[in-house]
Amino acid sequence: MPRYCAASYCKNRGGQSARDQRKLSFYPFPLHDKERLEKWLRNMKRDAWTPSKHQLLCSDHFTPDSLDVRWGIRYLKHTAVPTIFSSPDDEEKGSSQNSPQEIRREDQEETTKNVESKKVPVSLELCTPKKSSVTAENPDKKAEVICSTVLSKSLQVQKLQLENREDFEADSIILDNSSQQHIHQPEPVLMAAAVQNVEATDVHASVEVPVSCTATVLQFSDPDYLNSSLKLKNTLGSITDYTLENPNSHVVGCSVEVQPATENAVLVNAVTQTIEQLSGSEESVIAIIVPAESPKEPEIINRSFLPIKQEFLDTEEAETDNSLHMNAYNGLEILQTEHSYCKQDIDREHLWQKISKLHSKITLLEMQEVKTLGRLRSLEALIGQLKQENLLSEEKLKIVENCFTTLEVTMIQ
């Protein structure tokens, strides 16, 4: 039965360590000493209360002088009286003071709130074409993005800046191979993502030589506002080729060609992206360009952009499907190479012939086993006969010896 502290506003119980990692011990009331019991109850401010023999007080209510430590065990002195008791006000103060873990959790929540507060939707009402420029400052390269759009209704601007590769990995923005994702958004959204100093080696389909640079991509989710151009130094890009699949979805094709200082280039094709406008969820899509040098010819990298909330499930499902497919393929190769009867060139008749031969061999082995068992039994019978004959010969020898001994005794006499 667990032990509880009988003092009011005290929540200590047996098997539970204190807040400062101190061990608790419990002591019974001095029911046999009435004067001392009255002092205990008076200090507890419960004069009219009569405790039972099963009720205890914890060590937090006693001063260190009233405890006697022997062999690591704390014993209560016979004259000890509890003097430390908390009032309701102290209890409220104590509850208001959070533990370090709770403080850390609050700090983390505050940081997340601050990060979310930076992503405040800004409504813009524009009826005329407008040019918005975004410059990526770099000592070697400068990029200017000029977007001319006609906005007839309010837009939500959401910006997310990835400063280094760690932030790129922490935010879990994944480029998946040739897959179409359905992203639900209630309103058209203008999204801008800036990538700074991201090496091309982080992308699986990139070229071996790492080249770091800065790029900025603007993407529109509504087909009415997609007539925009992206211009970089020594680069050309466009956001075009948009079609409508159904009244509620839009397909966006985005191709960007990035040329570094050399003549080599990497062509990044953001293949297809389906955006469905529904009132249920609000998910952000971020387009990221990672250029790299190509040794011989420009390479084509096909990617589609995943929503942040669905990327983990999609990548895990793709990995499991790939692993299952590879395991099945390897199993077929092993069967076809190691076991001849699994080859597809062999006919059924040939297999049946092999099966009949195996059955005949099994019958021969069974007959040989019967013969060997019979031989073993005959040998066991012969061994038994020899043992009996040996016993008889030993008995005869004993009789002859006894006769000689009796003759010798008679001769001596």
From Swiss-Prot:
<feature type="zinc finger region" description="THAP-type">
    <location>
        <begin position="1"/>
        <end position="85"/>
    </location>
</feature>
<keyword id="KW-0175">Coiled coil</keyword>
<keyword id="KW-0862">Zinc</keyword>
<keyword id="KW-0863">Zinc-finger</keyword>
<protein>
    <recommendedName>
        <fullName>THAP domain-containing protein 5</fullName>
    </recommendedName>
</protein>
<keyword id="KW-0539">Nucleus</keyword>
<dbReference type="Pfam" id="PF05485">
    <property type="entry name" value="THAP"/>
</dbReference>
<feature type="region of interest" description="Disordered">
    <location>
        <begin position="84"/>
        <end position="118"/>
    </location>
</feature>
<dbReference type="GO" id="GO:0008270">
    <property type="term" value="F:zinc ion binding"/>
</dbReference>
<keyword id="KW-0238">DNA-binding</keyword>
<dbReference type="InterPro" id="IPR006612">
    <property type="entry name" value="THAP_Znf"/>
</dbReference>
<dbReference type="GO" id="GO:0003677">
    <property type="term" value="F:DNA binding"/>
</dbReference>
<dbReference type="InterPro" id="IPR052224">
    <property type="entry name" value="THAP_domain_protein"/>
</dbReference>
<feature type="coiled-coil region">
    <location>
        <begin position="375"/>
        <end position="399"/>
    </location>
</feature>
<feature type="compositionally biased region" description="Basic and acidic residues">
    <location>
        <begin position="102"/>
        <end position="118"/>
    </location>
</feature>
<keyword id="KW-0479">Metal-binding</keyword>
<dbReference type="GO" id="GO:0005634">
    <property type="term" value="C:nucleus"/>
</dbReference>
